[in-house]
Each structure stands twice: as structure tokens, then as C-alpha cells.
Amino acid sequence: KQLEAASWYDALGDLFMALSSRKGQQAQGQFFTPVHICDLMVMCTETDEKKTGQRINDPTCGSGRLLLAYHVRHLGNYLVAEDVNRTCCLMTICNMLIHGCVGEVIHHDSLCPENFMDGWMVNHTLTQTGIPSIRRMSEEEYRTSRNMSVDLLRKRKEKLRQMQPDKKQLP
């Protein structure tokens, strides 16, 4: 049913939540965004503007379902998933492989990005070979990618300032 409605399915996230709720792990504060909310969030961000070639980030990715929801509606973007839980990172990698997403998955606390634990590049050769792939990300690649994300955020912030000159400036 979900595949018909949304064109994506997160079996790993559903299984993880079912198992963790039985073990009392909800005390850790881990709840995945419901599928219909992921779809709604993506729909709320839609404009007539082209949505390809962008870098889309989820700093608390869980099983990657918000990125999956974005991917099925906006193909051709680079997805960056981050989570402090290694199991969640591994589920996101699997989901990205299954759904043909290109990007990276970073295992770290996104509130302390200098503490890189691990990372993976997902499907970077998919467009050339048609074969899904995963490879370990080096810490140097992580730092380069992180700097790119920070630069993009600065540019977007500046663009917002220019669009709203009579409004209070963003910090």
C-alpha cells in the first residue's frame, strides 16, 4: 500500500522501531518521523524551481526516510545523511542503495561535527556503471564535504538577506 502511495518504503525503519519499542529503547528518545509526515514535509517545500543538483541534508537521519521521501519527488540531488547511531547509519545506507540515492552517510553527532566517527559514500558510480556501490569515506573526504556544506549554507543565508532587505538581518 505504501509503495503505491509514496513510491518508497522503509521496511528497515519500521522493523527497527518495532523491535526497539519492545526492548524499552524508546527511553533513548529514538522515534522515526512517520512516513506521511515525511511526505508532507517534502510537499511543503515544493516550488516551481528546479530541484536537481542540490545538496540535501538530514542531520538526524534515522533510517533515512525523510531523504527517501525527497528523493522520489526530486531525482538528481546529492543526499547527505547524518546520525549518531551507527545502526541508523547502516539502515540509511541500505535504503539509499535500494532506492538508488546518491550521497553520503556520516556517523557522528551532528551537533559536534568535528567528532567524525565513520562515513560512507553511497552509489557514487551508479550513473556510470548502473551498479549500486558503497565505499568507506576518509576523514579528509568528510572534512572537505563538511566545508562544502558550510559554504552552501553561507551562500543561502546571504541570498535570503538580499531577498529581504527591509527585514531584520539574520545573525
Predicted regions and their residues:
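Short, functionally important structural connectors and interaction interfaces within domains
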Residues: K23-G24, G76
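Conserved aromatic-histidine-acidic binding/catalytic patches
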Residues: L3-E4, G29-Q30, V80
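Class I SAM-dependent methyltransferase Rossmann-like catalytic core
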Residues: G24-T33
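A short secondary-structure junction motif
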Residues: A18-K23, C44, D48
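Conserved S-adenosyl-L-methionine
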Residues: P34-V122
